Design a protein with these regions (language model features):
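C-terminal substrate-binding/active-site "lid" region of AdoMet-derived donor-dependent transferases
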Residues: 245-301, 307, 442-466
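Structural motif
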Residues: 164-167, 187, 234, 264-266, ...
Length: 567
């Protein structure tokens, strides 16, 4: 009889749960904590994943094991009331409660309720995530926890904190928690930069925003600026390596600076964690801390809607390895979309051989000569290409412009393959390329071409340098060719700035004033500089490059200088 009773008991769900927990030993405690959540009351799957920091598949396995002992209602589940006591006793809920470690940030979180309320409001109104760039929104509490932890761990008074990417809006939390810090944000998404900029002004925070696509360049104003860098990169080995390398480039304090990284992986696949941590090894970084499941997200359920927080410190070897790592990186670093690792083109074709013929034809209209072809790094090496136009990578164009040796004969044209443009490339190609004609192919859904409003806004930004034509549906229904033709050379400050987008704004503006023929006595350099500073509403951008400014700041700058100089 005793054997028969045992067999019946072991067939019950509670036995299946015990077997599942035993299979995870010694990490079974996390599954017991999941059971506590189920015993506390009805909870939906997303919340179970986020609060337990367990992969969705593991949570689903637990729900399947509990099976008929679950009570389900409206998409939520809980251990049935009549079964809860048995689970509490069998899996030692009291022991879990008695031995659970205290949250070291609990007191500070209680004192930061006002900051969290602000962050809830800020994050609720943020631009939608771009899934192709691996954007998954961190919770408001996570943004505040990051800020509190940084403030409790480091002396950030008077320090510079750089955010290498900031879709989570961590910069706004840090600014509120540590108002004595200056914060620099570099991001590819100009919507996010404008949003951060607006909130920084509203909250009176010292935050400076610059455009950067880390696959090609880090904004000059962000390079070598920081005492501490925070980044939450794409969760691929390539993304982790690239963002960490850019974080290193952002450090000014090479001896005592720190790189703080959020990186998540499923504990069902620890090799992915090893691959991510290998980025630190490739860059000669010493690991100082790893805080498990520190950040929580509204999504990313495959990795438990959570990521660990790593602290890395550079060594002398880091600076020896850095340039080689950056130069060897590819552009496909994300987990989804055309710029994911799976989306990389096969066969190593070059942008030149793959450039749509209609793009090449429009560069030859009206007597222009196609001299330069630009494409992104993901299109492969230029091996074997010796004839035809000169070829440059977008990284070169964005960083330094067209090399002087390629512009020896005029009129000349540049063709650019921007079919992988996430949104920031087209404007920056027009800023960087001092060509007589530029023809660029972009996706038809691109913000600058998808409707008349976007086209007008882009044309207005560059009107002192180019006139634009938009060939919709060319070379095919999914793309648009943008044709830019240089306008007659003018002497306005706007023209100077647009034609010297890689120079420091303050210097270029000053030189434009010195060169202007106004009929008034010539200005001295000091007088010209004083005039620039008097007209610029944001002094910090005078030391930045035009190509690195978010477009909302670029538009404001061109308005401020519009009435200076001739035409």
């Amino acid at each position: 009889m005793r054997c028969e009773t045992y067999a019946v008991e072991e067939a019950e769900p509670i036995a299946a749960v015990a077997a599942l927990i035993d299979a995870h030993r010694p990490d079974g405690r996390r599954l017991r904590e999941l059971l506590c959540l189920l015993a506390d009351g009805p909870t939906d799957l997303a919340e179970l994943v986020r609060r337990s920091a367990l992969p969705r598949k593991t949570v689903e396995e637990m729900l399947a094991a509990v099976g008929s002992d679950l009570a389900r209602e409206g998409g939520k589940a809980a251990i049935a009331a009549g079964k809860a006591d048995a689970y509490r006793k069998r899996f030692g809920f009291e022991q879990l409660s008695a031995t659970r470690l205290a949250d070291p940030l609990q007191r500070r979180l209680a004192d930061a309720v006002a900051v969290q309320r602000v962050m809830e409001h800020v994050i609720a109104g943020a631009p939608a995530a771009l899934t192709e760039l691996d954007h998954v929104q961190a919770t408001p509490e996570t943004a505040v926890r990051r800020a509190l932890w940084l403030d409790s761990t480091y002396d950030l008074r008077g320090a510079v904190v750089l955010c290498v990417g900031d879709h989570d809006l961590t910069s706004l939390a840090v600014g509120q928690v540590t108002p004595g810090a200056r914060i620099v944000v570099a991001d590819i998404d100009e919507r996010i930069l404008q949003y951060i900029d607006g909130w920084a002004a509203r909250l009176r925070l010292d935050i400076r925003c610059y455009v950067s696509d880390f696959r090609f360049w880090l904004a000059e104003a962000a390079a070598g600026c920081a005492d501490l860098v925070f980044t939450d990169p794409p969760y691929t080995p390539e993304g982790m390596t690239l963002f960490t390398a850019r974080a290193l480039q952002g450090l000014a304090n090479k001896d005592h600076g720190r790189v703080v990284v959020a990186y998540g992986y499923s504990d069902r696949h620890p090799s992915l964690g090893l691959q991510g941590q290998a980025a630190a090894s490739r860059l000669g970084l010493a690991a100082e801390e790893q805080l498990r499941a520190f950040s929580r997200y509204e999504g990313a359920q495959a990795v438990g809607s959570a990521s660990d927080l790593y602290v890395w410190r550079p060594t002398s070897r880091s600076w020896q390895l850095l340039d080689g790592v950056v130069s060897g990186m590819q552009a496909n670093i994300y987990t989804r979309g055309g710029q994911s690792l799976e989306g990389a083109p096969q066969g190593g074709h070059s942008g030149w051989s793959a450039m749509p013929p209609p793009v090449l034809r429009v560069t030859a209209d009206d007597g222009f000569q196609l001299r330069v072809v630009a494409a992104s790094a993901w299109t492969g090496a230029w091996a074997g290409q010796t004839a035809g136009p000169a070829r440059i990578r977008l990284g070169t164009l964005f960083s330094t412009g067209i090399p002087a040796g390629m512009m020896t004969r005029t009129p000349f044209a540049l063709a650019a393959d921007l079919r992988a443009d996430p949104g920031a490339w087209l404007l920056r190609v027009l800023l960087a390329a001092n060509a007589d004609r530029v023809a660029a192919v972009v996706p038809s859904g691109h913000r600058d071409v998808r409707d008349e409003a976007g086209q007008r806004a882009l044309a207005a930004l560059v009107e002192s340098k180019f006139t634009l034509r938009f060939l919709n549906g060319q070379p095919d229904a999914g793309n648009t060719i943008v044709v830019a033709t240089a306008v007659s050379s003018g002497t306005s400050v706007a023209t100077w700035l647009l034609r010297q987008a890689h120079g420091k704004i303050g210097n270029v503006w000053r030189d434009a004033l010195l060169a202007a023929d106004t009929g008034e006595p010539a200005l001295t350099k000091r007088e010209a500089r004083a005039s620039v500073e008097a007209r610029a509403s944001r002094q910090e951008i005078l030391s930045a490059r035009l190509i690195d400014l978010p477009r909302h700041q670029l538009a404001l700058l061109l308005e401020e200088c519009d009435d200076v100089g001739g035409t």
